[in-house]
From Swiss-Prot:
Protein name: Phosphonates import ATP-binding protein PhnC
E.C. code: 7.3.2.2
Species this protein is from: Pseudomonas fluorescens (strain Pf0-1)
The gene coding this protein: phnC
Topology of the protein relative to the lipid bilayer: Peripheral membrane protein
GO molecular-function term, one example from the UniProt record: ATP hydrolysis activity
Subunit structure: The complex is composed of two ATP-binding proteins (PhnC), two transmembrane proteins (PhnE) and a solute-binding protein (PhnD).
Reaction it catalyzes: phosphonate(out) + ATP + H2O = phosphonate(in) + ADP + phosphate + H(+)
InterPro entries: AAA+_ATPase (IPR003593), ABC_transporter-like_ATP-bd (IPR003439), ABC_transporter-like_CS (IPR017871), MetN_ABC_transporter-like (IPR050086), P-loop_NTPase (IPR027417)
Family, per entry: Belongs to the ABC transporter superfamily. Phosphonates importer (TC 3.A.1.9.1) family.
Sorted UniProt keywords: ATP-binding, Cell inner membrane, Cell membrane, Membrane, Nucleotide-binding, Phosphonate transport, Translocase, Transport
A GO cellular component entry from the record: plasma membrane
Length: 265
């Protein structure tokens, strides 16, 4: 299997229990959508699968490795095989799109090669090809601050496609896109995963998009998995229980501006 969680709990420092006894197995090449109301723990679950955060208790296995039993160096090598798409990609405003996309390989390059790439992009054709898949080839040398929220999200996706990971995790990857573009972008991700046998796991707030594009659906509420089944078996009653006291999201949420985060050195 590619991903496995066994009785995983996550307690934040403020006392909030984000995940409660999660058991989850995902095989190589599977495509899975995680749905649930705001605050259900979807982002926490994805970050745990990405080994970005350590479970408070329980066990996690990623690509055959017990991630938190590895040395820091070994875990860093493991992370280079995992791609994570952020809802708001942390792209410096003045960074050129070509540099942002090529950053997908930083975990696989030496320090010297990475520094050279900051001054002189080393694989312009590769970056252009990744952007072309998302209809953004014309933005290759634009600054990130010149792009819309939806375009920034697509740059983040292009960066992960260029990285070519074995596991692709996407946290609300189309939240700033209109319904048509959101569906088109998810189709691109799904096709890429299928053609390259990549394991794809995405959290989505838009239930209809999840049901339309993913064969397996995991319903998460208050840090617990309420159901895990083929999309064709997801019923209205199951969704009503999952989203009790919540309003189901339409095919894609209203476009909201993204805050571009500048990573600190």
């Amino acid at each position: 299997m590619t991903l496995r969680l066994k009785q995983a709990f996550l307690h934040h420092t403020n006392g909030v229990e984000a995940l409660r006894g999660v058991d989850l197995q995902i095989e190589a090449g599977e495509q899975v959508a995680i749905i649930g109301p705001s605050g259900a723990g979807k982002s926490s679950l994805l970050n745990m699968l990405a080994t970005a955060i350590r479970p408070s208790s329980g066990d996690i296995e990623v690509l055959g490795e017990r991630a938190w039993h590895l040395s820091a160096r070994q875990r860093q090598r493991l992370r280079a095989r995992i791609g994570l798409v952020h809802q708001a990609p942390p792209l410096p405003p003045r960074q050129r799109v070509v540099t942002a996309v090529l950053a997908g390989k930083l975990g696989q390059w030496s320090l010297g090669k990475s520094l050279i790439n900051l001054l002189h992009p080393l694989d312009v054709p590769g970056a252009r090809a990744a952007l072309a898949k998302l209809d953004l080839a014309d933005k290759l040398f634009s600054q990130c601050q010149q792009l819309s929220g939806g375009q920034l999200q697509r740059v983040g996706i292009a960066r992960v496609l260029y990285q070519a990971p074995e596991v692709l995790l996407a946290d609300e990857p189309v939240s700033a896109m209109d319904p048509v573009l959101a569906g088109h972008t998810l189709s691109i991700l799904s096709r890429h995963a299928r053609e390259h046998n990549v394991t794809l796991v995405a959290s989505l707030h838009a239930v209809e998009l999840a049901l339309a594009h993913f064969p397996r659906i995991v319903g998460l509420r208050e840090g617990r998995i309420l159901f895990d089944c083929p999309s064709a078996q997801v019923s209205r009653d199951m969704l009503d229980t999952l989203y009790a006291n919540e309003q189901l999201q339409s095919p894609a949420p209203a476009v909201t501006p993204l805050i571009v985060q500048i990573p600190r050195c």
